[in-house]
From Swiss-Prot:
Biological process terms in GO annotation: translation
Cellular component aspect of the GO annotation: small ribosomal subunit
Disulphides: none
CDD domains reported in the protein's UniProt record: uS7_Bacteria
Functional description taken from the UniProt entry: One of the primary rRNA binding proteins, it binds directly to 16S rRNA where it nucleates assembly of the head domain of the 30S subunit. Is located at the subunit interface close to the decoding center, probably blocks exit of the E-site tRNA.
InterPro entries associated with the record: Ribosomal_uS7, Ribosomal_uS7_bac/org-type, Ribosomal_uS7_CS, Ribosomal_uS7_dom, Ribosomal_uS7_dom_sf
This protein's UniProt keywords: Ribonucleoprotein, Ribosomal protein, RNA-binding, rRNA-binding, tRNA-binding
Subunit structure: Part of the 30S ribosomal subunit. Contacts proteins S9 and S11.
The protein's name in its UniProt record: Small ribosomal subunit protein uS7
Gene Ontology MF terms in the entry: rRNA binding; structural constituent of ribosome; tRNA binding
Domain of life: Bacteria
Family according to the record: Belongs to the universal ribosomal protein uS7 family.
């Protein structure tokens, strides 16, 4: 591993409609095969559904959903003398956001609604109300960390 300087963080350009960096990041995590325009269409469509159906401001619902899905703890495998332990560690702030976005996208795709816009809107509203599969994933991650608290002294 080279012992050079730390790699500088890339500047994230805010999305054109909401002028928000988190929305731009979420668009990128929603994107498949480089189709950014499609991803933006899905996200903005989902925001419109949230505004129309649920009569709430979509950017507020989005932020609340992200906050509710962000994990505080996770487990990492650590090998000690032939045995592998699941060691609970605190999640770095950037990784919290990245995991929350990834889980929201993953569990939106797995829902039963017809279009991706509807699925994403439903998952965002559920997550904002502390329901849904993405929130369940966060709770499972926390439970796993809690169950393996005994191995916390193996942290590095």
């Amino acid at each position: 591993m080279p012992r050079r300087r730390e790699v500088p963080k890339r500047k994230i350009i805010p999305d054109p409609k909401y002028k928000d960096k988190l929305v731009a990041k979420f668009t990128n995590s929603l994107m498949q095969s480089g189709k950014k325009a499609t991803a933006e269409g899905i996200l903005y469509g989902a925001f419109d559904i949230v505004r129309d159906r649920f009569k709430e401001e979509p950017i507020d619902v989005f932020r609340k959903a992200l906050d509710n899905v962000k994990p505080k703890l996770e487990v990492k495998s650590r090998r000690v003398g032939g045995a592998t332990y699941q060691v609970p560690v605190e999640v770095r702030p950037e990784r919290r956001v990245a995991l929350a976005m990834r889980w929201l996208v993953t569990y939106s795709r797995g829902r039963g609604e017809k279009t991706m816009r509807e699925r994403l809107a439903a998952e965002l509203v559920d997550a904002a109300q502390n329901r849904g599969n993405a929130v369940k994933k966060r709770d499972d991650t926390h439970k796993m960390a809690e169950a393996n608290k005994a191995f916390a002294h193996y942290r590095w």
